[in-house]
Amino acid sequence: MSAIIDSFIAPPCHDEIEILWQDEHLVLINKPSGLLSLSGKNPQNRDSVHYRLVQTFPGCTLVHRLDFGTSGLMVIARNKAINAALCHQFSQRAVRKVYSALLCGHVEHDEGVIDAPIAKDPALFPLMSICAITGKPARSRYQVMDRFYDAALPLTRVRLTPETGRTHQLRIHCQQLGYPILGCDLYGGLALPGTEQIPRLMLHASELNFVHPVSAEAINARHAAPF
């Protein structure tokens, strides 16, 4: 099998990372859209959340990632012990994440569940695919918050709650539902007339709930979507 070659070069991101809260153990940030979570192998993809934060917080590590185009809440561990404890919470699905998104079209039902297994396919890289045979279980909940009745580009604002954490899960699940996320270049969010000039992926990590590994305090972080 031939090696997968990632030719993506991230354009410069001039937006700053917003530090929302910190203590000696962890940092909560608001990641801007258009910034990698981790630096890529290509030297031109050096700029990232981790690259920037390690300058201020030496030894910090990423517990989880957000896609390049996704903005919003991330928790950063400031040492290996905190990283291990938070990773355990993620692996046990003890961390609750909620996203805000704008979807193309008017979603028919006010709420629902998308249960569709997701598979990697080297032939489709970087796209993922829905596949009942080789896919891993993937489940997302959605709730309609508002519908916008613009005749040229009808949209729906939704809350998305992933119950699993597959690559591109929310993006491909919304496409599977029939309403791609506005601005999504991989899964149909730039295909409709009027979407060509959308400046970003309209997906934002707006809620992050976990237990502080040291104090055992429930952390319920919130950050409103900028769209």
Residue ranges and their predicted role:
Residues S39-N42:
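Short, solvent-exposed loop/turn segments at secondary-structure boundaries
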Residues G59-L86, K120-L177, L203-F227:
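The conserved catalytic core of RNA pseudouridine synthases
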